[in-house]
């Protein structure tokens, strides 16, 4: 009699639900998954090696391109590692700006996660709504850095420049009528802080809108409740962090447990799940929208009342002001030296971690006293989550695999590095 064997199937890398270039080799018994073997490396760009041949400052833009959905948070961990080795004091205003943009980035990340996760499961409306809000947040990125995504805004010792006093305005064109432009520029009459404040006032209603569409939706619950269950013990053993760990009921958040920058001065809560399934992880991230909004509001209030420097006064690390360079030759030479040769970091090693939207994002930096890192190791949260995919999907149907990949919020820029 012929032997009955499991069916082997390729999932991805050209699959709309693969979230990038994920290739899974699935072993199936009928439509039930027996084993899921992730094959990674299709987006490997050698970031860790590239950083060894670039000055410390030149590697900042590489960080944006790791998890290309949470740009500024990646930069944050990198500059914090450099600051640890240098023993640099970051001005308080710069710390508040960093925290504010970290939370803006968290909302940006979760909006894309929500839209893509819902679209994978079959709910299209949320995807369109999420991109409407992302547009406003990209405008905030653009106002401070000139780039809508890869900002390269953080610097060792602070940030590139202070927040602008006025927002860029839309102009009339062949595709935008006078009425359209007037409507678009309505909330752009003030400063960037006014624009962000206007967004934070509108955003809670948008979150309620997403919840109306999904939270009590019968089909959404059927597709997510009891799917991809991870117990608290297994979540910790598998190295999960962020919403994946908190969804299983473990209240671990670096912003509370190991506060960095000014998080210990701010008032916010850490949402946790109960059952550790896709639905609980969805609820955790939805509540994170509201908590991030709370943090941004507190940062706006503080930044309005406290002007000041936004980068360290250590001239070995920070460039001279642009106004000075226009009439002082010494300042121009100083600027040129800083951006060609770079600054030297004392020999030693440091690990800096931030609460990234996906989990704990860490940078382990080793310096040999040169102007380039001797070794840069990136701890990507998605890497540990993808490693747990096999365990999470066993016994589930192929259709549930799509929901589990969505709940993990995988981005291959950071996994393949």
Swiss-Prot record:
Protein localization: Cell inner membrane
One Pfam family, short name: Complex1_49kDa
Catalytic activity: a quinone + NADH + 5 H(+)(in) = a quinol + NAD(+) + 4 H(+)(out)
Stored InterPro entries: NADH_Q_OxRdtase_suD (IPR001135), NADH_UbQ_OxRdtase_49kDa_CS (IPR014029), NDH1_su_D/H (IPR022885), NiFe-Hase_large (IPR029014)
EC supergroup of this enzyme: translocase
Keyword Transport: yes
GO MF term set: NAD binding; NADH:ubiquinone reductase (non-electrogenic) activity; quinone binding
Record flagged with keyword Transport: yes
EC number: 7.1.1.-
One GO CC term on file: plasma membrane
Recorded topology in the membrane: Peripheral membrane protein
Primary location: membrane
Keywords in alphabetical order: Cell inner membrane, Cell membrane, Membrane, NAD, Quinone, Translocase, Transport, Ubiquinone
Domain of life according to the entry: Bacteria
Record's function text: NDH-1 shuttles electrons from NADH, via FMN and iron-sulfur (Fe-S) centers, to quinones in the respiratory chain. The immediate electron acceptor for the enzyme in this species is believed to be ubiquinone. Couples the redox reaction to proton translocation (for every two electrons transferred, four hydrogen ions are translocated across the cytoplasmic membrane), and thus conserves the redox energy in a proton gradient.
Subunit record text: NDH-1 is composed of 14 different subunits. Subunits NuoB, C, D, E, F, and G constitute the peripheral sector of the complex.
Similarity remark: Belongs to the complex I 49 kDa subunit family.
Protein name: NADH-quinone oxidoreductase subunit D
Record organism: Methylobacillus flagellatus (strain ATCC 51484 / DSM 6875 / VKM B-1610 / KT)
Annotated gene: nuoD
